[in-house]
Amino acid sequence: MRIVFMGTPSFAEVILRALVENEDKKIEVVGLFTQRDKPFGRKKELKAPETKTYILENHLNIPIFQPQSLKEPEVQILKGLKPDFIVVVAYGKILPKEVLTIAPCINLHASLLPKYRGASPIHEMILNDDRIYGISTMLMDLELDSGDILESASFLREDYLDLDALSLKLARMGATLLLSTLKNFHSITRKPQDHMQASFCKKIAKADGLVGFKDAKNLFLKSLAFKSWPEIFLENSLKLLEVELVENEKSHKEGEILAIDERGVLVGCLKGSVRIARLQAVGKKPLKAKDYLNGRRLKVGGILT
């Protein structure tokens, strides 16, 4: 079984690794299509996608392609690889009709479709406080995340997970699911999506990290969803790090400092309160909340702004 893999970030790297290292020798990854290296950090040094890095660091004999688009001659390159399946996991490009007709294109999407079609399904699961997390394999068509569902898997949330932890758990679950889909593809009964039940999610922007002290639960969920980027911050760009939901019932003044100790600062919201372990001002290193407040001469009863 010849597989062309299309994927870019660490989530996709987990899936690629599972395909390459799978004990079933019938599966062979014959090519990787991924996004181009991008400038990273203050020095803007080029950083390779995680999928590409995995192949290079392990000296795997898998050709790597980083095209600007999936037009000619990329279509001919794909045909030349003679794939039985094209597997797409967080690739970052729309597949044109010319690619979709080369071989069955299977997308692993991090939601229980038709829920959360689009670019940020894992963020949405967290932000919406979902009790059930899941992942789906789908036969791709020309529309965004709208193809027939092949298989799905899910689990009941026991503890709150931040974006990194939930992504890793879903990726590992997705790797197992994808292997099942590939092995059983011809016997799987495809399930058309109910488009009337579809919901959509957008690409995360820097502005999404802006928070205020109105709803403690909402602030806490944002801290989980945006942990890696853009993080959460107040209007003055003060970052709130390591946020814990204390309660979500009592009413307080927005940003009122209720208590300060070694664990952090307890801050009141219009609904509920949160404990913040560390704070980071613009251009500064993160500080323990207690040290930051001492430097600003903020005490219990003051307002964190």
Swiss-Prot record:
Q: What is its EC number?
A: 2.1.2.9
Q: Which reaction does it catalyse?
A: L-methionyl-tRNA(fMet) + (6R)-10-formyltetrahydrofolate = N-formyl-L-methionyl-tRNA(fMet) + (6S)-5,6,7,8-tetrahydrofolate + H(+)
What keywords tag this UniProt record? Protein biosynthesis, Transferase
Q: What class of enzyme is it?
A: transferase
Name the CDD domains for this protein.
Answer: FMT_core_Met-tRNA-FMT_N, Met_tRNA_FMT_C
Gene3D superfamilies assigned to the protein according to its UniProt record, in alphabetical order: 3.40.50.12230
Similarity comment: Belongs to the Fmt family.
The protein's name is Methionyl-tRNA formyltransferase
Species, as recorded:
Helicobacter pylori (strain J99 / ATCC 700824) (Campylobacter pylori J99)
